[in-house]
Regions:
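All-alpha prenyltransferase/terpene-synthase fold signal
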Residues: 1-339
């Protein structure tokens, strides 16, 4: 867990956060580490370009903090109560409001959301600071390129949630996934190459190739994540199964489910998707519908196809070396978790 050790080292040297609740909430997800997929990707891309992955530790910590702030804000937007099997940042903040300030439930909810927004903002500044101290040009790239791409994808996700299903297109959903998920994977990959080669990602053909490989892997990862959100095990997934149905998330999985339904079935789907009070029986009906109409198999095949093509591009770009083999294993792990 070198990435998280580096993060805690950096945060330990950040003396300006003195407000107890803000520190507690901003660091809440870091106390329950994720898989650190993006720092691992960065280190492997650095090695593939002839560098030493140790050189990416600070940049990897920055990318993981960047990823974490986006999760905090995303959980507020999606009204999620669990992340990695633990209360989300705004839920943690609300509990602090009840316990320490004796707030009513309504006021505590507002307090928790405000804390999580500020906590996410704080982690974003830490991410940029950590990257800029180590690699100034990559810190600037994080601000000028990565952040707008990711935020555009997030906003498109929000906008799509207000569109009727019959006005959605697969193109819009792919665009959303490329911004919301693919951009950070691509950034991690190009940073690894840039650190190894000592040049800007724009000046490195290998950085561009591995960024495309990583972005495509991110798309496969997102498709797998969407499947886990409906068919996974809550204890392993760390979030309530079926929450995407109750939230009416506009995913490729659910759009294809909608498009495979008859008008009568669409009316029933419309009464369930986005209904926070949908019953367990209704959620199960949607799950069975997805299975029966082969949509689950379609999405699994789509993820496998994207991953296979990404690995082929990787193997065309790099000679057979241990880092290339590790990148292939890393990529395969993104989809393997749904099998």
């Amino acid at each position: 867990m070198e990435t998280y050790e580096k993060i805690h080292e950096f945060l330990g040297n950040a003396p300006y956060v003195t407000e107890e609740h803000l520190r507690t909430v901003s660091e809440s997800y870091l106390r329950h580490p994720g898989k650190a997929l993006r720092p691992r990707l960065m280190g492997l891309c650095c090695e593939a370009a002839g560098g030493n992955s140790e050189a990416t530790l600070s940049a990897g910590a920055a990318v993981e903090m960047f990823h974490t702030w986006s999760l905090m804000h995303d959980d507020i937007i999606d009204h999620d109560a669990l992340r990695r099997g633990h209360p989300t940042a705004h839920v943690t903040g609300a509990q602090l409001g009840r316990d320490n300030l004796h707030l009513s439930d309504e006021c505590a909810k507002d307090y928790g959301e405000a804390l999580a927004i500020l906590g996410g903002d704080l982690l974003l500044t830490h991410a940029i600071g950590c990257m800029t101290e180590a690699f100034p040009s990559l810190g600037l790239r994080m601000c000028r390129k990565l952040a707008p791409e990711l935020l555009s994808g997030e906003q498109l996700d929000i906008r799509l949630s207000y569109l009727p299903w019959n006005q959605l297109s697969e193109e819009l959903i792919w665009e959303m996934m490329r911004g919301k998920t693919g951009a950070l994977f691509a950034f991690a990959a190009e940073c690894g190459v840039s650190i190894a080669q000592g040049i800007s990602p724009e000046d490195s053909p290998l950085a561009r190739t591995l960024a495309k490989f990583a972005s495509d892997c991110g798309l496969a990862f997102q498709l797998a994540d969407d499947l886990l959100g409906i068919f996974g095990e809550e204890a392993k997934f760390g979030k309530p199964i079926g929450s995407d149905i109750r939230e009416g998330k506009r995913t490729l999985l659910m759009l294809r489910t909608w498009n495979s339904a008859s008008p009568e079935e669409q009316r029933r789907l419309e009464s369930i998707l986005g209904n926070s009070r949908a019953t367990v029986e209704e959620i199960e009906w949607v799950r069975e519908f997805i299975q029966k109409h082969g949509v689950r198999t379609q999405i699994e095949s789509e993820a496998e196809k994207i991953l296979t093509e990404a690995i082929q591009s990787l193997e065309s770009a790099l000679p057979p070396t241990p880092p290339r083999n590790q990148l292939r294993i890393w990529a395969e792990s993104l989809v393997k978790r749904v099998k």
